[in-house]
């Protein structure tokens, strides 16, 4: 296969199982505050003390600085978003509303640094328990990630939905930016931890995109934080699932495949950046202060569905 080695039927079953588990886990933790508290506060404390020091140690494929930073930054996002959702004073505080784009930007920056780092290694071998192939694709995708970061916009328009779930709604974060993010992030995972990308790339990204498009529109970042935290906690506790279990699916490590996914990611993010520049210039808008896409039907429908 082009992107991956052979994918047996039981790995496809596991893939759909992971996808379903992440979507269900997200639904549980977003609907009930007690569930979010248990999963994103109590469970990580237990795992940090009793599990991860053994399962995600230096000899593990999840024992790198990136995985440790990623799990805690994802959890920080979950807790920060819960604070905004459940503490009324924060919902109108401009500094508090700057937290969601800040934590998102930090997560994107972490991945860009890692892509550039892998590119600079000049390797085609096992590194930190993961087979890596360095090449121009790392730099291409790092640039795509920076463009994705720079096109984050409209955060002062974040508000809390008026239903019982009290979701964090970001109307200006529309479908085209989300797709560009997904393409970039899949390329990142494929470039830097390719043998994890069947699950940590495809299944994980789809698990937050489906809710954002079909279950609770406008809450993509909340869905992303929840599913990422759930996946990172699991994979740091059971790294063998994606590396050596019967369900593991290895990447092809094909230069053409690496180049293709990064080129698509770069093209998508260039397109979003150019469109955003057009909107800013045409509407004379300030991307650091204004919501940019208020004229679009997609924006209006998200906002109207949650107020």
Identify the meaning behind each predicted range.
Residues 58-64, 123-138, 249-261:
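Membrane-interface segments at the starts/ends of alpha-helical transmembrane spans
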Residues 40-59, 78-86, 101-119, 175-191, ...:
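Hydrophobic alpha-helical transmembrane segments and adjacent interfacial helices
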Residues 18-23, 200-306:
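C-terminal transmembrane-bundle signature of multipass membrane proteins
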Residues 12-22, 70-85, 141-157, 204-209, ...:
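Hydrophobic cores of alpha-helical transmembrane segments in multi-pass inner/ER membrane proteins
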Residues 1-89:
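An N-terminal, globular interaction/scaffold subdomain
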Residues 13, 39, 69-72, 95-102, ...:
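Alpha-helical transmembrane segments
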Residues 91-218:
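Generic multipass alpha-helical transmembrane bundles of integral membrane proteins
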